[in-house]
């Protein structure tokens, strides 16, 4: 199955589908309609965003990034972040639930 076929767009909405959910982390496919997003929040775990289709603006700790298809970014644990779909876009979100030192940086 192609990554872009894992989840379908829905008008005016954000759609998610959990692909893997285990104690050590999750892998989730998302489809955002244009203009949809996730308001600023924090997560206790590092999160890797892989853009499968379209474009997204991501803010991490007051720094802005624009990602397009084929690009990725790490949202470090406990750092405020938000997402806004520039166009319809799909992503894979990998949450890593691990204790210990965090070496993640955005790009």
What are these model-predicted stretches?
Residues 77-101:
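Ligand-binding loop in jelly-roll beta-barrel domains
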Residues 26, 55-57, 64, 80, ...:
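Structural motif
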Residues 13, 26-43:
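Conserved short histidine dyad/triad with adjacent acidic residue
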Residues 1-24, 104-107:
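A short, N-terminal "cap"/entry segment at the start of jelly-roll beta-barrel domains
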Residues 62-77:
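Short acidic-glycine-tyrosine-enriched beta hairpin
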Residues 52-53, 68-69, 87:
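A cytosolic small-molecule/anion-sensing beta-strand core signal
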Residues 31-33, 43-58:
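Short, conserved beta-strand element in jelly-roll/cupin
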Residues 38-40, 58-59, 75, 80-86:
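Short beta-strand His + acidic residue motifs that chelate non-heme Fe in jelly-roll/DSBH
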């Amino acid at each position: 199955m192609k990554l872009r076929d894992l989840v379908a767009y829905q008008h005016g909405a954000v759609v998610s589908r959990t692909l893997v959910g285990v104690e050590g982390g999750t892998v989730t496919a998302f489809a955002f309609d244009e203009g949809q997003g996730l308001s600023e929040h924090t997560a206790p775990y590092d999160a890797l965003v892989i853009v499968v289709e379209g474009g997204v603006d991501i803010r991490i700790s007051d720094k802005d990034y624009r990602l397009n298809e084929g690009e990725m970014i790490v949202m470090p644990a406990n750092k405020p972040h938000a997402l806004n779909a520039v166009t319809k876009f799909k992503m894979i979100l990998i949450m890593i639930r691990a204790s210990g030192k965090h070496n993640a940086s955005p790009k």
